[in-house]
Curated annotation (Swiss-Prot):
The gene is Dusp12. It comes from Rattus norvegicus (Rat). This is Dual specificity protein phosphatase 12. Its cofactor is Zn(2+). Its EC number is 3.1.3.16, 3.1.3.48. Substrate binds at residues 115-120. The lineage of its organism: Eukaryota, Metazoa, Chordata, Craniata, Vertebrata. Monomer.
Length: 339
């Protein structure tokens, strides 16, 4: 039978308890109406009914309920994820947090579970606490571990939650933080990938018209061909040298942040559509202007070091002295070259 434990965190709700269960089957109430557990907690619909749980979020390799299983009124969400550092959990966090929040707002008790109830589900619940209580990753995780001492997410999930914090507890797909994260996830699978995801590439600025807002374009200094927009630049903090992958670091020093990069002699950008043919199937090479073939910079999926010392992985590097920065004024349709 399911054993539901009620933690002492200011909640007066009394959770029902039944006969003792294995550790993996425990469902611990970590916040009012929010439970955290393992696979045994969803072994049968009767267990959930006894605990008053009517919403289940499964973060595992397989869904908790086959099609048509469960019981009437049960809401469920399945997020496919392995308990490995390289698993992309970050991209699913907004959907998970929204599911938990919506269910609780409807007065439902929610169970978040994975297989053992110590890593994947812990990461999701930590993200929910971070967002709803505006806590740092460290504070939210520490609080959860006081309630469920065996909670121990893998280092990859820890890194992803730090990125989640850096983005303000919301996954902004247009932010430099997320773009660099997405590139790193592709790098982990490269060069085995047969095709690069289309969404990995920024739109070629020559294929879209100027928007309603002022914009900054970067053009080939030799032939004036538009190459990329300001939004494609992945700003970074100053560094002191190469470190393997960001999730192996202890802090947020690897997170790309907007800052003063006056000493940097290159722009590190997200790949743009005109680069696609040059990137596929090779680990490194030159980046040439698609119009005049002038050398603009280089790329390396394993990373390159900026002149400021920061190691960027992967790296799509454009030398500043090979491009001009041009501000476009849409109202006048004019362009002004910056000095």
């Amino acid at each position: 039978m399911l054993e539901v434990q009620s933690s002492n965190h200011g909640c007066e709700r009394q959770a029902p308890t039944t006969s003792p269960a294995s550790s993996a089957g425990h469902a611990v109430e970590v916040r009012p109406g929010l439970y955290l557990g393992g696979a045994a907690a969803v072994a049968g619909p009767d267990y959930l009914r006894e605990a008053g749980i009517t919403a289940v979020l499964t973060v595992d390799s397989e869904p908790a309920f086959p099609a048509g299983a469960g019981f009437e009124g049960l809401q469920s969400l399945f997020v496919p994820a392995l308990d490995k550092p390289e698993t992309d959990l970050l991209s699913h966090l907004d959907r998970c947090v929204a599911f938990i929040g919506q269910a609780r707002s409807e007065g439902r008790a929610v169970l978040v579970h994975c297989h053992a109830g110590v890593s994947r589900s812990v990461a999701v619940v930590t993200a929910f606490i971070m967002k709803t209580e505006q806590l740092t990753f460290e504070k939210a995780y520490e609080n959860l571990q006081t309630i469920k001492p065996e909670a121990k997410m893998n280092e990859g999930f820890e890194w992803q939650l730090k990125l989640y914090e850096a983005m303000g507890h919301e996954v902004h797909t247009s932010s430099a933080v997320y773009k660099q994260y997405r590139l790193q996830k592709v790098t982990e699978k490269y060069p085995e990938l047969r095709n690069l995801p289309r969404e990995l590439f920024a739109v070629d600025p020559t294929t879209v018209s100027q928007g309603l807002k002022d914009d900054i374009l970067y053009k080939c200094r030799k032939c004036r061909r538009s190459l990329f927009r300001r939004s494609s630049i992945l700003d970074h903090s100053e560094g002191s040298g190469p470190v393997a992958f960001a999730h192996k670091r202890t802090g947020l020093s690897s997170v790309l942040t907007t800052g003063n990069q006056a000493q940097c002699t290159s722009y590190f950008i997200e790949p743009v559509q005109w680069m696609e043919s040059a990137l596929l199937g090779v680990m490194d090479g030159q980046l040439l202007c698609p119009k005049c073939s002038a050398k603009l910079g280089s790329f390396n999926w394993y990373g390159e070091q900026c002149s400021c010392g920061r190691w960027i992985t992967p790296a799509f590097q454009i030398h500043k002295n090979r491009v001009d920065e041009v501000k476009t004024l849409p109202a006048l349709g004019s362009q002004t070259k910056k000095p």
